[in-house]
Amino acid sequence: EMRGGTIAAVGEGETWRSRTSSATVIAARDVAGPGAILTPGFVDIHGHGGGGFSYESDESDIRAARALHLARGTTRAVLSLVSGSLEHLTAQAARIAAMTHTDAGILGTHLEGPFLDPGHRGAHDPAALREATPDAVAALLAAGAGTIRQITVAPELPGAPKTIRTFVDAGVAVAVGHTDADA
Protein backbone atom coordinates (compact mmCIF):
# COMPACT_ATOMS: atom_id res chain seq x y z
CA GLU A 1 0.00 0.00 0.00
CA MET A 2 1.29 3.47 -0.87
CA ARG A 3 0.53 6.61 1.14
CA GLY A 4 1.97 9.95 0.12
CA GLY A 5 4.59 8.36 -2.11
CA THR A 6 5.79 6.04 0.68
CA ILE A 7 5.32 2.30 1.11
CA ALA A 8 3.04 2.06 4.13
CA ALA A 9 2.16 -1.64 4.18
CA VAL A 10 3.51 -4.92 2.82
CA GLY A 11 2.43 -8.51 2.94
CA GLU A 12 0.91 -11.26 0.89
CA GLY A 13 -2.48 -12.86 0.64
CA GLU A 14 -4.83 -11.55 3.32
CA THR A 15 -1.98 -9.95 5.28
CA TRP A 16 -0.96 -7.41 2.67
CA ARG A 17 -2.79 -4.67 4.54
CA SER A 18 -0.74 -5.21 7.69
CA ARG A 19 0.79 -1.97 8.91
CA THR A 20 4.53 -1.97 8.94
CA SER A 21 7.45 0.34 9.48
CA SER A 22 9.76 1.69 6.82
CA ALA A 23 12.58 -0.32 8.46
CA THR A 24 10.65 -3.53 7.74
CA VAL A 25 10.19 -2.54 4.11
CA ILE A 26 13.86 -1.68 3.72
CA ALA A 27 14.87 -4.99 5.30
CA ALA A 28 12.55 -7.02 3.03
CA ARG A 29 14.71 -8.75 0.44
CA ASP A 30 12.81 -11.93 -0.46
CA VAL A 31 10.96 -11.89 -3.75
CA ALA A 32 8.63 -14.62 -4.96
CA GLY A 33 9.63 -16.17 -8.27
CA PRO A 34 12.94 -17.94 -7.74
CA GLY A 35 14.81 -18.16 -11.02
CA ALA A 36 12.69 -15.43 -12.57
CA ILE A 37 13.99 -12.12 -13.82
CA LEU A 38 12.25 -8.95 -12.73
CA THR A 39 12.58 -5.99 -15.06
CA PRO A 40 10.64 -2.83 -15.70
CA GLY A 41 8.05 -3.20 -18.43
CA PHE A 42 9.26 -2.87 -21.99
CA VAL A 43 8.43 0.25 -24.03
CA ASP A 44 7.85 -0.31 -27.75
CA ILE A 45 8.43 2.80 -29.87
CA HIS A 46 7.81 1.18 -33.27
CA GLY A 47 5.18 -1.50 -33.67
CA HIS A 48 2.27 -1.90 -36.04
CA GLY A 49 0.11 -4.31 -34.01
CA GLY A 50 0.31 -7.92 -32.96
CA GLY A 51 -1.45 -11.26 -32.98
CA GLY A 52 -3.14 -10.47 -36.28
CA PHE A 53 -4.49 -7.16 -34.98
CA SER A 54 -3.38 -3.84 -36.47
CA TYR A 55 -3.01 -0.35 -35.04
CA GLU A 56 -4.43 0.77 -38.40
CA SER A 57 -7.82 -0.66 -37.44
CA ASP A 58 -10.56 0.12 -34.93
CA GLU A 59 -10.30 0.51 -31.17
CA SER A 60 -11.08 -3.14 -30.43
CA ASP A 61 -8.24 -4.34 -32.68
CA ILE A 62 -5.87 -1.81 -31.14
CA ARG A 63 -6.80 -3.02 -27.64
CA ALA A 64 -6.41 -6.68 -28.70
CA ALA A 65 -2.91 -6.02 -30.07
CA ARG A 66 -1.98 -4.11 -26.93
CA ALA A 67 -3.27 -6.95 -24.71
CA LEU A 68 -1.03 -9.40 -26.56
CA HIS A 69 2.02 -7.20 -26.03
CA LEU A 70 1.12 -6.48 -22.40
CA ALA A 71 0.90 -10.21 -21.67
CA ARG A 72 4.49 -10.51 -22.89
CA GLY A 73 5.92 -7.60 -20.90
CA THR A 74 5.47 -4.56 -23.13
CA THR A 75 3.70 -2.18 -20.78
CA ARG A 76 3.74 0.93 -22.98
CA ALA A 77 3.85 1.59 -26.68
CA VAL A 78 3.94 4.27 -29.32
CA LEU A 79 1.59 2.92 -31.99
CA SER A 80 3.04 3.06 -35.51
CA LEU A 81 0.99 3.81 -38.62
CA VAL A 82 2.21 3.17 -42.16
CA SER A 83 1.67 5.64 -44.98
CA GLY A 84 -1.97 6.02 -45.90
CA SER A 85 -4.34 8.67 -47.13
CA LEU A 86 -4.37 11.88 -45.14
CA GLU A 87 -7.95 11.10 -44.14
CA HIS A 88 -6.96 7.67 -42.77
CA LEU A 89 -3.89 8.95 -40.94
CA THR A 90 -5.74 11.85 -39.31
CA ALA A 91 -8.61 9.57 -38.27
CA GLN A 92 -6.22 7.02 -36.74
CA ALA A 93 -4.10 9.69 -35.04
CA ALA A 94 -7.27 11.15 -33.51
CA ARG A 95 -8.46 7.67 -32.42
CA ILE A 96 -5.11 6.93 -30.79
CA ALA A 97 -5.01 10.38 -29.17
CA ALA A 98 -8.40 9.70 -27.57
CA MET A 99 -7.22 6.29 -26.36
CA THR A 100 -4.25 7.85 -24.55
CA HIS A 101 -6.75 9.39 -22.13
CA THR A 102 -8.10 5.99 -21.06
CA ASP A 103 -5.05 3.73 -21.47
CA ALA A 104 -1.78 4.84 -19.88
CA GLY A 105 -0.02 2.12 -21.88
CA ILE A 106 -0.67 3.96 -25.14
CA LEU A 107 1.88 6.76 -25.41
CA GLY A 108 0.81 8.19 -28.76
CA THR A 109 1.47 7.75 -32.45
CA HIS A 110 4.50 7.17 -34.65
CA LEU A 111 3.75 8.19 -38.24
CA GLU A 112 5.95 6.11 -40.52
CA GLY A 113 5.22 8.33 -43.49
CA PRO A 114 3.54 9.54 -45.64
CA PHE A 115 6.46 11.86 -46.46
CA LEU A 116 8.80 9.15 -47.77
CA ASP A 117 10.95 8.75 -50.89
CA PRO A 118 9.07 6.55 -53.40
CA GLY A 119 12.33 4.87 -54.43
CA HIS A 120 12.89 3.69 -50.85
CA ARG A 121 9.31 3.04 -49.85
CA GLY A 122 9.78 -0.54 -48.70
CA ALA A 123 6.32 -1.98 -47.99
CA HIS A 124 4.58 1.40 -48.18
CA ASP A 125 1.90 1.81 -50.85
CA PRO A 126 3.35 4.23 -53.42
CA ALA A 127 -0.11 5.76 -53.89
CA ALA A 128 -0.09 6.78 -50.21
CA LEU A 129 3.17 8.73 -50.38
CA ARG A 130 2.88 12.50 -50.70
CA GLU A 131 4.74 15.75 -50.55
CA ALA A 132 4.85 17.43 -47.19
CA THR A 133 2.56 20.44 -47.45
CA PRO A 134 1.84 22.85 -44.60
CA ASP A 135 -1.86 21.87 -44.72
CA ALA A 136 -1.10 18.14 -44.44
CA VAL A 137 1.31 18.73 -41.57
CA ALA A 138 -1.20 20.95 -39.75
CA ALA A 139 -3.95 18.35 -40.21
CA LEU A 140 -1.80 15.57 -38.76
CA LEU A 141 -0.69 17.64 -35.79
CA ALA A 142 -4.26 18.77 -35.07
CA ALA A 143 -5.58 15.21 -35.26
CA GLY A 144 -2.85 13.95 -32.94
CA ALA A 145 -3.73 16.61 -30.35
CA GLY A 146 -0.23 16.60 -28.86
CA THR A 147 0.19 12.80 -28.94
CA ILE A 148 2.21 12.34 -32.12
CA ARG A 149 5.55 11.25 -30.68
CA GLN A 150 7.57 10.52 -33.82
CA ILE A 151 7.40 10.84 -37.60
CA THR A 152 9.63 9.30 -40.23
CA VAL A 153 10.49 11.71 -43.06
CA ALA A 154 12.71 11.58 -46.15
CA PRO A 155 14.53 14.93 -45.79
CA GLU A 156 15.25 15.38 -49.50
CA LEU A 157 11.57 15.72 -50.45
CA PRO A 158 10.13 19.11 -51.42
CA GLY A 159 8.91 20.89 -48.32
CA ALA A 160 10.71 18.51 -45.96
CA PRO A 161 12.95 21.06 -44.19
CA LYS A 162 9.97 23.21 -43.20
CA THR A 163 7.99 20.08 -42.30
CA ILE A 164 10.77 18.83 -40.06
CA ARG A 165 10.99 22.21 -38.31
CA THR A 166 7.21 22.31 -37.78
CA PHE A 167 7.14 18.82 -36.26
CA VAL A 168 10.18 19.53 -34.05
CA ASP A 169 8.59 22.79 -32.86
CA ALA A 170 5.49 20.76 -31.95
CA GLY A 171 7.60 18.41 -29.79
CA VAL A 172 7.61 15.51 -32.26
CA ALA A 173 10.81 13.48 -32.73
CA VAL A 174 11.71 13.35 -36.42
CA ALA A 175 13.45 10.26 -37.77
CA VAL A 176 15.15 10.17 -41.15
CA GLY A 177 14.00 7.10 -43.03
CA HIS A 178 12.88 5.64 -46.35
CA THR A 179 15.22 8.17 -47.91
CA ASP A 180 17.61 8.60 -50.81
CA ALA A 181 19.87 10.75 -48.61
CA ASP A 182 23.34 9.29 -48.27
CA ALA A 183 25.07 11.75 -45.96
Predicted feature locations:
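Conserved beta-strand segments that form the floor/walls of ligand-binding pockets within enzyme
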Residues: 1, 38, 44, 110, ...
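Histidine-rich, glycine-flanked metal-binding segment
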Residues: 1-39
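Divalent metal-coordination and catalytic microenvironments
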Residues: 5, 35, 46, 69, ...
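Short, intrinsically disordered, charge-balanced linker/junction segments flanking boundaries
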Residues: 6-8, 62, 182-183
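A structural micro-motif
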Residues: 23-24, 28, 36, 75, ...
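Metal-associated gating/positioning segment near the N- to mid-region
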Residues: 36-88
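Histidine/acidic-residue-rich, glycine-tolerant segments that coordinate divalent metal ions
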Residues: 59, 85-183
